[in-house]
Each structure stands twice: as structure tokens, then as C-alpha cells.
């Protein structure tokens, strides 16, 4: 049995005209987006002649073919074959009479499903799915048919919820433009296989399916929980006055960047069945926010490394100016690399490659853009490892610690743990794009654990942070006689 994932081949590749003037390009794109109506299928007619001549013949039946006329599906892609192996459709009447003589024309291309979901169907000997091409150009899809008599006398289904106790639907008819059909073979020698891409108005939800539960139910829930946790971290470091130093501002910014990435990934989950513009915009925002988070983490590591190397250490004296410098570095590098990645995707990446690597009907950021987005992240991780190793050596050489040294050491430990957690989550994100279900499930689990670990690292593990939270939240309690404030209370307690 063939694997039920098959990249359909776009027949009429359109070469987008590139304009050097940015304003003109933006205006043209706006006009095109407003004026274009969704077509029923991305296709072209194989024979010469005008569309008027084709539509004027009432006996001519248009058949939507996935590949070119001289191609069939071989191992998940369209390949050219000999003329003897061409796909010859067999038409069946509504009464079940097979091999009907019908005058037809091929319309090449996969269906433009729009908001509906494209779904691959295979018809081979012994399969539960049967594909029948009707003599008016419609495609009939039989499901759960046990024999041919049951197929011919099946009950039509509109994929709506049936009343309890009624019979299950046995077939559904797809109009022209909502399907494409073709012949399929495999290198293992499986012949006489029919393949079709159909547009499902509503995919049947199987709540017992672990894949559906993990990807469409638990994954969005995990993203929502992560958004709440990151918001809590950002609020704590932004509201408490004693935490609003340079390190606190950096942690707040990293939390906000990760919030944007989680929100963009959540949008990607729910836009797989909608306009490709929303999907690719969410893809770009996801990569942009992750890149910004790692540049800010790199700024955090540089600050700690430079402070430990400096002999004259003064905290919170020029934090505002330093934050401006780090902001210029982090946001400037992020914006530059993001602009290069977007430019490379739209203008340098091959059009055929972008058409072959899609999620359903949605265009995604290509590997060229991903490399430009994520190569700097790999570089910042390596630089941060250098900061960690050299700073660790400097800490081991110290024999005397004061309050400032304890606080710097606590910040160094927080930086190290954040680097470890964020790097592991980033690696699993990359591996999840390798089209392997196991890696995707691992990424969902790791992404769900990332933000609770960050909450522990940045808040729960920091005793002075929990002390400030208790002092701020429990303001109605009578003041303790031993309460000397945050700075004096932890001057020699080594609670950082």
C-alpha cells in the first residue's frame, strides 16, 4: 500500500515578474490580492484551442488530471512515462454501466481547495476506498464498501453528521474542480492504482486518533499555557521595581519574544486550511521572534561575560544606556537577517521548489529562508557557549564573594540554564520539520516543557524573586521585626 502522502505537481508554473521598485511592487500585490477571485483549480487544458470552443461543445467532459498528460505518479511524484503507460480514464454511468464512451479533455493541475482540506485517496485491489469517474466528469468516492454490489447501490453522503442509528455513508460525489485523478505506480511493482486529491469540506474528526489529539487538541492547549506562563514571567520582571535592572529588562524582552513565537506557532496550527498569506506571515513572524530571542540571550551572555572580566563593577548605574546599546544590536541584527531571509524566499528560492514543499495548499518559508533565519541562531549558541566556558573559569578563580558577586553568579546560572533550555527547544523545532511524526511529537512535548522550565529558572529558583513576590502580594501582613529589606536581608545570605 502506498503511503498516503503525495506531493501533487503544479502543471502551469507561473514566473512572477520581479520589480525593482518596492512601492510599485507593494501596490501591484495589493491590487492583485483585491482583484483575484479564487479559481476552482490551478490548471490548464492539454489541447490547443480557446476556452470558448471547449465550453461550446456540450458533449465534451473535462477531467481534472493531477499530472501532465505524459506523466503519472511514481513514488510520490510526477514522472514522465511511455505512451503505453498513459492514464486512460474509464467512465461509469450513474446506473453502474462501466467503460462508457465519453469525449473528454484533460484539465491539468491539483484542485484549489481554498478553505477546504486537500486529502489524498488511493484505489487499489483490496482497499476500502474506491474511485469511480462518472460520465459527466464527477468523481465518486466509495468508502467502506465491502463488494461491488454494495458500491453500485451505495448511499450518498454529504459528510454531515448522521442521526444516531442510521447507516454510514458509502459514497460521495465531487464536482469538477474539487478533485484531480491520475494513475499511480510504485517502485515495488504495485500497478493498477488510482490516485486522487479531493477537497474535503469537513474532515471527519476521530477523537480516538492519537495523532489528531496531540497535534490539534493538546498542542494548542500547550501553546496557550505557554503564553500565560511567559506573560507571568514578563509581568514579574517588569512590575517589581528591584528587578527592573538591565538583567530584568533582558529577561522581560526574551519572554515577550517567546510569547510572539508561541502565538505565531498557534496561528500556524489553525491556518493550515485558510489563505496561504496568513500561513506564511505566521511562519515569518515565528522565525523572526525566535531569532530576536536568541540575539537577546546573546546580549545577556555578553553582559555577564564582560562584567566578570571587568575589575570595576557597578550595577544599575548605566543600565538604561546599556539596554539601548543591546537593543540596537539585537533588533538591528534580527531585522537585517529577517529582511535577507524574506528577500531570499520570494526572489531567490526556486519557484518549483516552493510549489513542491507546501503544507496542504499553503506556501511555507523555504529551506533557503530557514537557513538564513536560523544560521545566526546557531552562531549565537556557539558564542554563548564560549561566554559560558570563559565565565565559568573566571568564577572558579574567585575566592572572595560579596553581594554583587553573588548576584552576578545567580545571573550567570540563570543565563546558563536559559541557554540550555532554549537551545534544546530550538533543535527539536528544526527536527520537527523533517517530516517525521516521532520528531514532531517530541517537539510538541519539548515545547510544552520549555516555558515551565523557564518559569522555574527565572522565578521559582530565584529566592530573592520569590521573596519580593511574597512581600508585594502579601502586603496586608504585619511587617516582620527581622525584615531589613531585600538588599540587607540577602547581603550575606547567598540566596541569589
UniProtKB/Swiss-Prot annotation:
Positions annotated as glycosylated: 82
UniProt-recorded Gene Ontology molecular function terms: G protein-coupled receptor activity
Extracellular membrane side: 1-219, 268-276, 349-366, 433-438
Keywords: Cell membrane, G-protein coupled receptor, Glycoprotein, Membrane, Receptor, Transducer, Transmembrane, Transmembrane helix
Mode of membrane association: Multi-pass membrane protein
Domain of life: Eukaryota
GO biological process terms, semicolon-separated: cell surface receptor signaling pathway; determination of adult lifespan; G protein-coupled receptor signaling pathway; heart morphogenesis; response to starvation
Transmembrane segments annotated in the record for this chain: 220-240, 247-267, 277-297, 328-348, 367-387, 412-432, 439-459
Matching PANTHER family: G-PROTEIN COUPLED RECEPTOR MTH-LIKE 1-RELATED, G-PROTEIN COUPLED RECEPTOR MTH-LIKE 5-RELATED
Family: Belongs to the G-protein coupled receptor 2 family. Mth subfamily.
Descriptive protein name: Probable G-protein coupled receptor Mth-like 5
Amino acid at each position: 500500500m502506498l503511503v498516503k502522502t503525495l506531493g501533487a505537481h503544479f502543471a502551469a508554473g507561473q514566473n512572477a515578474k520581479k520589480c525593482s521598485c518596492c512601492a510599485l511592487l507593494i501596490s501591484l500585490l495589493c491590487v492583485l490580492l483585491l482583484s483575484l477571485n479564487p479559481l476552482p483549480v490551478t490548471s490548464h487544458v492539454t489541447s490547443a484551442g480557446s476556452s470558448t470552443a471547449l465550453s461550446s461543445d456540450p458533449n465534451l467532459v473535462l477531467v481534472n488530471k493531477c499530472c501532465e498528460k505524459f506523466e503519472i505518479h511514481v513514488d510520490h511524484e510526477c514522472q514522465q512515462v511511455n505512451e503505453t503507460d498513459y492514464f486512460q480514464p474509464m467512465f461509469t454511468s450513474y446506473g453502474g454501466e462501466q467503460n462508457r464512451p465519453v469525449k473528454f479533455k484533460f484539465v491539468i493541475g491539483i484542485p484549489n481547495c481554498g478553505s477546504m482540506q486537500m486529502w489524498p485517496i488511493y484505489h487499489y485491489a483490496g482497499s476500502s476506498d474506491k474511485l469511480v469517474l462518472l460520465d459527466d466528469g464527477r468523481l465518486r468516492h466509495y468508502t467502506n464498501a465491502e463488494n461491488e454490489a454494495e458500491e453500485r447501490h451505495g448511499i450518498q453522503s454529504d459528510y454531515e453528521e448522521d442521526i444516531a442509528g442510521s447507516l454510514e455513508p458509502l459514497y460521495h460525489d465531487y464536482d469538477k474542480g474539487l478533485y484531480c485523478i491520475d494513475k499511480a505506480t510504485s517502485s515495488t511493482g504495485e500497478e493498477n492504482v488510482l490516485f486522487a486529491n479531493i477537497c474535503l469540506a469537513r474532515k471527519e474528526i476521530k477523537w480516538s486518533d492519537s495523532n489528531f489529539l496531540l497535534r490539534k487538541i493538546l498542542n494548542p492547549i500547550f501553546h496557550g499555557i505557554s503564553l500565560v506562563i511567559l506573560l507571568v514571567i514578563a509581568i514579574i520582571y517588569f512590575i517589581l521595581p528591584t528587578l527592573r535592572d538591565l538583567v530584568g529588562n533582558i529577561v522581560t524582552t526574551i519572554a515577550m519574544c517567546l510569547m510572539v513565537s508561541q502565538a505565531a506557532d498557534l496561528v500556524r496550527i489553525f491556518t493550515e486550511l485558510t489563505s496561504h498569506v496568513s500561513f506564511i506571515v505566521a511562519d515569518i513572524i515565528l522565525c523572526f521572534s525566535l531569532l530576536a530571542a536568541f540575539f537577546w540571550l546573546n546580549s545577556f551572555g555578553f553582559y555577564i561575560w564582560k562584567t566578570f572580566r571587568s575589575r570595576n563593577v557597578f550595577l544599575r548605574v548605566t543600565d538604561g544606556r546599556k539596554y539601548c546599546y543591546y537593543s540596537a544590536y539585537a533588533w538591528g541584527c534580527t531585522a537585517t537577517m529577517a529582511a535577507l531571509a524574506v528577500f531570499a524566499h520570494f526572489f531567490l528560492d526556486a519557484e518549483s521548489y516552493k510549489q513542491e514543499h507546501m503544507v496542504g495548499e499553503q506556501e511555507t518559508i523555504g529551506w533557503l529562508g530557514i537557513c538564513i533565519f536560523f544560521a545566526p541562531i546557531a552562531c549565537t549558541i556557539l558564542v554563548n557557549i564560549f561566554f559560558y566556558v570563559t565565565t565559568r573559569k573566571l568564577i572558579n578563580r574567585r575566592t572572595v564573594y560579596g553581594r554583587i558577586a553573588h548576584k552576578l553568579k545567580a545571573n550567570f546560572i540563570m543565563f546558563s540554564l536559559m541557554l540550555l533550555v532554549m537551545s534544546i527547544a530550538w533543535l527539536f523545532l528544526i527536527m520537527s520539520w523533517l517530516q517525521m511524526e516521532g520528531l514532531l511529537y517530541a517537539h510538541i512535548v519539548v515545547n510544552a516543557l520549555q516555558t515551565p522550565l523557564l518559569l522555574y529558572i527565572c522565578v521559582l529558583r530565584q529566592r530573592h524573586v520569590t521573596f519580593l513576590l511574597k512581600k508585594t502580594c502579601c502586603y496586608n501582613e504585619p511587617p516582620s521585626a527581622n525584615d531589613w529589606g531585600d538588599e540587607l536581608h540577602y547581603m550575606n545570605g547567598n540566596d541569589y
